[in-house]
């Protein structure tokens, strides 16, 4: 009888120790494992004080859902770091969004703060509205640091398409707009730190 595992988590001790000296921010993402094994690789990346990528934790799972993301983030909390005030940057995947508001997993306020990747937000935006001009305005609003200028950009978006403004206002500004971030995300606007590892499984 062949045995196999459904899930596997790992984080190296030097990374766990080194993360204590990194910025209080994590980016998380998942990617398919290439080859004969139909698995998902989950990745958590930190950022050191020189703004360099810092690989922290990994997992293999059967798929991306609420249960697998909950398990992965619980492993990080239990095995890797219990630090408070962590900022977690992710895509808009519903499974992640549900897990990060679960008070029992330790990733809701004030233990952690969730922020959305700008690229994923823009991609979801284009799926709904397919307007490159409005997408450019959204990206400008996302990166704007002054609330007054952010409000001006949002007003412009609303004048062009009220449905677009309603869609954006349904998402907490603090999750995607730098002007409302409260200095949680260290100006890191995307999950590119995790994406850079997505090509690694191609050699597995």
Tell me the role of every PLM-derived stretch.
Residues 1-204:
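DNA-binding interface regions
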